[in-house]
Amino acid sequence: MTQVTVGENEGIESALRRFKRQVSKAGIFGELKRLRHHETPVEKYKRKLQQRRRSRRR
């Protein structure tokens, strides 16, 4: 779960930007899209293949 603590002198906009960045890094939106619709075995294979390729680059 992503959590952001707003500092005493920090604006809401900057806290919201930090929250969006953390959600993006955690991959929450991608997982939400994946869980929202049925995924065929071929789609699952392609997704995992793509993940492996991405992890090799890093």
Curated annotation (Swiss-Prot):
Region (Disordered): 36-58
Signal peptide range: none
Gene3D superfamilies attached to this UniProt entry: Ribosomal protein S8 (1.20.5.1150)
Biased composition range(s): Basic residues: 45-58
GO MF, one annotated term: structural constituent of ribosome
GO biological process: translation
GO cellular component terms, A-Z: ribonucleoprotein complex; ribosome
UniProtKB keywords: Ribonucleoprotein, Ribosomal protein
NCBIfam families cross-referenced by the UniProt entry: S21p (TIGR00030)
PANTHER family xrefs: MITOCHONDRIAL 28S RIBOSOMAL PROTEIN S21 (PTHR21109), SMALL RIBOSOMAL SUBUNIT PROTEIN BS21M (PTHR21109:SF0)
Family: Belongs to the bacterial ribosomal protein bS21 family.
Protein name according to UniProt: Small ribosomal subunit protein bS21
Protein species of origin: Prochlorococcus marinus (strain NATL2A)
